[in-house]
UniProtKB/Swiss-Prot annotation:
GO terms for cellular component: mitochondrial inner membrane; mitochondrion. It comes from the Eukaryota. Belongs to the COQ10 family. SUPFAM superfamilies: Bet v1-like. This is Coenzyme Q-binding protein COQ10, mitochondrial. CDD domains: COQ10p_like. It is found in: Mitochondrion inner membrane. One of its GO terms (biological process) is ubiquinone biosynthetic process. Coiled coil: none annotated. InterPro entries: COQ10-like, COQ10_START, START-like_dom_sf.
Amino acid sequence: MVLIIRPSQTLILFRKAMLKPIGRYPLKRNFFGLSGTNHTIREQRYVLRKAINAPPSTVYAAVSEVAQYKEFIPYCVDSFVDKRNPVDNKPLIAGLRVGFKQYDEEFICNVTCKDTDHTYTVVAETISHNLFHLLISKWTIMPHPNRPNAAMVELLLRFKFKSRIYNSVSLIFAKTVTELVMNAFAKRAYHLVRLAMLKPSSKEGSP
């Protein structure tokens, strides 16, 4: 779910050199088309922590509402929720579709959202395995220890491509991807804060 990035020179060269047509969608291509032997590929992990100037509940709202990803994540052409928790209405099964020119991929994930003692977690694990042996993202959101109305956010990304080549090349850009995703959510959370501030108070207009 987190491999949605703005193209950079490295990524453009990467695509030109490595991408092959698959034909999954009409007039489209898959991002990745190579396969490898599972035992030769190692799982990769990236952890990024960032202070975000928004309350933890606002950051949690931005991260957990997958259906809105298409509104603010670059090249996310569609995002959706197939199943929600009947108790809190948070996603249980969700997905997104990433498109860039003629390339197209869709990710479906099991999603687990938890709110425990002012600490929020959102875990997404892919159940569509055309690209990865493993793809898991975990967001941990908690109050900032020194700044009121701010959050301390950690994003853990674990993945293992089916392709040995892509698993190796990903070492070049995975850290940048993680940072871009974190920044996209930071901007989204700030946007939600501004919307809340501009929303008329329920007391306005009362006699």
